[in-house]
Amino acid sequence: MRGILKYLALAAGYIFYIYFIAANRFGSDNMSYIDDMILHVQQKNATQPEFVQAATEVLDSIRPVVEANRTYQDWALLERLVEPERATVFRISWADDAGKVHTNRGYRVQFNSAIGPYKGGLRFHPSVNMSIIKFLGFEQIFKNSLTGLPIGGGKGGSDFDPKGKSEMEIMRFCQSFMTALYRVIGPNTDVPAGDIGVGGREIGYMFGQYKRITGQYEGVLTGKGLSFGGSLARTEATGYGLVYLVEEMLKNHANSIEGKTIVVSGSGNVATYAIEKALSLGGKVVTASDSSGFVYDPDGIDVATLKQIKEVHRARISEYAKERPNATFYEGKKVWGVPCDIALPCATQNELGAEDAKELIKNGCIAVGEGANMPSTTEATE
């Protein structure tokens, strides 16, 4: 009898072991393929919170489609989707105006080329790290595929801070950055663009260096000036597109932007041209911001003044309040406490949290249009 019990115990232990391995590899009855993948992403990228957040949101949103088609699991489609094809980290050394040498870190994540060459912007900001570049590159896959064009997804950048740097310092940094980057990009391989901290000026410096090194003039960078191969309306496209999308959303509810009070965060390309288009459709935009705080203008943001300050003088948003007598600058504050009908987060990732979302609802906001990459936290979305 004792021998039989021992045999049964060993058998039970073996069965449990097989079940444990199977559950971890293929998912148990209580854990779906999507749940397995979310856990896999969290465990494998534990030090990359932004990427984990983006991947989790995407995976959860495609749950019904994936779980209705076993083929995706059989071919390990999601395992391949969440892993970049190539990630490059490189050193950038450059000299400031005093001759002192500085070193920054550069990144290029080439996430997916299933339907075409990698495509995605370059971001210069001190917060840049591998997690942020991976999250941006991952989301770029889907944004690009939705255009219907044969382009894949990627992203890059550096922890270089352009604020407070002279024109020559920015030029030297961009040239050094491209000297390291040019080896992994090309018109049929990877086509970078601009993002935070990288506008037409920076793209021009990098394109010039690429042309100097390779002797080629092909369109390896988008966002160039019109005089050397750029596209009309490239600068305005994202901001205008955001407002057109919000207008169509409202039309589905027998409403429109006309006559609405709008708060916008940010003061870069996306924010500036979202403000411009919202004003042209009859909306009243009352805020703009940067990392130092925001301005509130009860008369409506004056786009010409905003462009002069941010694009020509490259000054802080606080300068706007000095030019407009009725405008007020709020240092270190967010725009979400300002009463509005529509909110357009156009600054950076995770800028709109759960408490901000509650504040918007309390103040009567009826629509949120996301212009930045993942501007709302998961809690805010819920």
Residue ranges of predicted features:
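Short hydrophobic targeting helices and cationic amphipathic motifs
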Residues: 5-8
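Short, Lys/Arg-enriched N-terminal segments with co-localized hydrophobic residues
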Residues: 14-30
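N-terminal ligand-binding/catalytic initiation module
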Residues: 31-232
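Gly-rich Lys/Arg/Thr-decorated short loops/hinges at beta-loop-alpha junctions or inter-strand turns
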Residues: 117-118, 219-230, 312-323, 336-340
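Glycine-rich phosphate/diphosphate-binding loop of Rossmann-like nucleotide-binding domains
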Residues: 233-334
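Phosphate-coordination loops involved in phosphoryl transfer and adenosine-cofactor binding
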Residues: 258-261, 340, 365
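A glycine- and small/hydrophobic-rich beta-loop-beta segment
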Residues: 323, 329-340, 344, 354-360
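Rossmann-fold NAD(P)-binding glycine/threonine-rich loop
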Residues: 347-382
